């Protein structure tokens, strides 16, 4: 029984087939949204750290609830993800969120948890994109056009002395 369970989670195709044919992602986002009723902005923005952004469906559904609670306040999201396929899916969702919430900043990284926790971003490469336009369609086009730039800079290698994943640097 243990081997079968392990095989299920080790096979990306089997896992994706399951999560994409159920409403688990929506249920997770709706459950998280319940905590917003007691949430307050304590500094300059409402901040979210998503420690496994995946394809973006959970965070984007949650962002619609955050917008409902804080419609004018700044929202800053830092998402961690290493899969370029998931990043491309995430970009497809984000145009609607940026259109709905004009004060949204979304940062996606493949830094390790240790680097994030220790604020060690010496090898960090920043790609900044300010969206222009007045429709979610226009925002989606701009985000989807970033795919190649991200792909060129998202390549990761595993350092043999640690588990830290580093973005490929162009010299």
Question: Could you describe each region identified by the protein language model?
Answer:
Residues 27, 57, 88:
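Residues that form or flank phosphate/diphosphate-binding pockets in enzymes
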Residues 1-43:
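Class I SAM-dependent methyltransferase Rossmann-like catalytic core
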Residues 43-57, 77-78:
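Conserved class I S-adenosyl-L-methionine
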Residues 41, 61-171:
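Class I S-adenosyl-L-methionine-dependent methyltransferase module
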């Amino acid at each position: 029984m243990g081997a079968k369970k392990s095989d299920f989670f080790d096979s990306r195709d089997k896992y994706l087939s399951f999560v994409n044919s159920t409403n688990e992602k929506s249920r997770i986002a709706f459950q998280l949204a319940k905590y917003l009723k007691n949430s307050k902005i304590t500094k300059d923005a409402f901040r979210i750290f998503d420690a496994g952004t995946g394809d973006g469906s959970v965070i984007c559904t949650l962002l619609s609830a955050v917008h409902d609670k804080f419609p004018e306040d700044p929202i800053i999201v830092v998402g961690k993800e290493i899969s370029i396929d998931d990043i491309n899916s995430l970009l497809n969702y984000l145009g609607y969120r940026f259109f709905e919430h004009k004060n949204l900043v979304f940062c996606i990284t493949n830094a390790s948890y240790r680097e994030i926790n220790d604020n060690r971003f010496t090898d960090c490469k920043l790609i900044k994109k300010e969206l222009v336009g007045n429709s979610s369609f226009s925002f989606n086009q701009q985000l989807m056009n970033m795919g190649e730039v991200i792909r060129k800079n998202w390549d990761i290698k595993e350092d043999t002395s640690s588990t830290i994943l580093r973005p490929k640097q162009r010299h």
